[in-house]
């Protein structure tokens, strides 16, 4: 899976040392994804975290208890999930 981090309606993904999966490559052609270094201390600045992968498709992270992070919105998740769902027919 790949991670998307949302801040001020902009989508970010870690810049370095990440395997770019098939689902991520597909979404990258459809939406604007900014690449930047993301540190654990920065996580609290994001309103949404989205997992994208071949197995589950597009999934919103609701919380990360260990660092006390909680999702604040579903706006971008709904947009990304809609793009993924309408283009990927599940059999």
Regions found by a protein language model. Name each.
Residues 1-91:
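Helix-start/capping segments and mature chain N-termini
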